[in-house]
């Protein structure tokens, strides 16, 4: 499962995500959020407060192209 660490948050996706639109699971401690990449929106969040979620969305937007490249590279195999 490809994982990209950005400012302490693990952005990852799973092989079973292949049939879904591009997204990442963002993990930190025991918290997790699922973020769609096109457009960048929250699908769900467990454990993050609104400030943390806002930061995660900002990081996702800032790294959107990079995350999409990893997604496309992984699932084009």
Predicted regions and their residues:
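Short, charged/polar N-terminal "headpieces" of proteins
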Residues: 1-20
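A general marker of short, structured functional hotspots
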Residues: 5, 9-10, 40, 44, ...
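A short, structured beta-strand/loop element
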Residues: 14-50
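C-terminal structural segments of small proteins and small subunits
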Residues: 49-77
């Amino acid at each position: 499962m490809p994982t990209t660490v950005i400012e302490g948050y693990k952005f990852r996706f799973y092989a079973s995500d292949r049939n879904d639109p591009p997204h990442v699971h963002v993990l930190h401690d025991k918290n997790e959020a699922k973020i769609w990449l096109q457009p960048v929106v929250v699908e769900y969040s467990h454990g993050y407060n609104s400030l943390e979620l806002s930061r995660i969305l900002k990081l996702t937007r800032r790294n959107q192209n990079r995350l999409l490249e990893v997604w496309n590279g992984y699932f084009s195999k």
